[in-house]
Amino acid sequence: MKSWQKVIVGGASLTLASTLLVGCGSASKDKMDSASSSDSKTIKLWVPTGAKKSYADIVAKFEKDSGYTVKVVESEDPKAQEKIKKDASTAADVFSLPHDQLGQLVESGTIQEVPEEYTKEIAATATDQAIVGAQYKGKTYSFPFGIESQVLFYNKSKLAAEDVASYDTITTKATFGGTFKQANAYATGPLFMSVGNTLFGENGEDVKGTNWGNEKGVAVLKWIADQASNKGFVNLDANNVISKFGDGSVASFESGPWDYEAAQKAIGKENLGIAAYPKVTIGGETVQQKAFLGVKLYAVNQAPAKGDTKRIAASYKLASYLTNAESQENQFKTRNIVPANKEVQSSEAVQSNELAKTVITMGSSSEYTVVMPKLSQMGTFWTESAAILSDTFNGKTKEGDYLAKLQQFDKDIAATK
């Protein structure tokens, strides 16, 4: 690995004059000075698709304060890891990404720990769940700027606010729509954490820490199987959720902010209710149903700077600007990104927005959400858990085989490289 890929910034000010280089080998000071002086004062920034215009003011402010020029490029967040790891030296200095990619980027040495100045800043301003999303193995590697969680959408002409606090009440008085026949593990998998089981351990970072193969896990599968005969449950597929909500076939369903406008259009603004997830009774115990929490991040890639400590420090400064309170307020206003900043979350503008307020309720406590693990083994999780969930609902897997299936699942996940 080249020396500039192992730069660790010891400070964050733009006047940073030195840095610790790990594994430099025979690289000389003259070579480093030459590289530093020849680099342009341009920082490449990758922002989410459709977000370039919304960052114009904060980027202009940074350019004025720092003396650096920022080249802003829109890039698809889900492909951030793939693009960065392909050639880090030609990628962006600062880039946006979903938090579940963080672990692999850290393990590959692509990104380094955030300087202490910013770590303290993040700890003081971000919610606890957002901080967890920005960390890996207890260290902070990125800057959180938004949170995302599913919520419950319901038809207020069919269900009252007090009704939707309980899944049993929802399905007794009206109907709930879910995709169980072709299970979506993103939506249904967290039921196992709702009963106290773990996915990759308590912090989501232990490959051998999944423990679904127990009595509680079996109870979850029994509950899923029971929904096939629950008159208040309507099985849906990914393509008909909104249409079934619109024609009255289902009175409620769980989804994310991405379905808000469609849900509103389907039944009318005056009829659309939004609530946190309900409580659900599984194995005779009433528990709070949980969802996965996603955290939107900005991270710094030191490779393009090739050891230029001032440019690296400026990149961290830019990431701080992009995720400060002012920027998060603007992202909420222009793009409906629910902020990770505690102060912005409590603002009148955010609290008066029913959807944002509900996402914050879901995303501000481990009672309602589990921060999605950041391990590469999640690829195996999505495939295998979806198969188990679908086979259970469809009756392909019999009750007597539930425990063995889950125990094998735990082993398969632990053995994945």
Show which residues each predicted segment covers:
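Short helix-initiation/N-cap motifs at beta->coil->alpha
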Residues: E74-K83, D100, V234-D247, W258
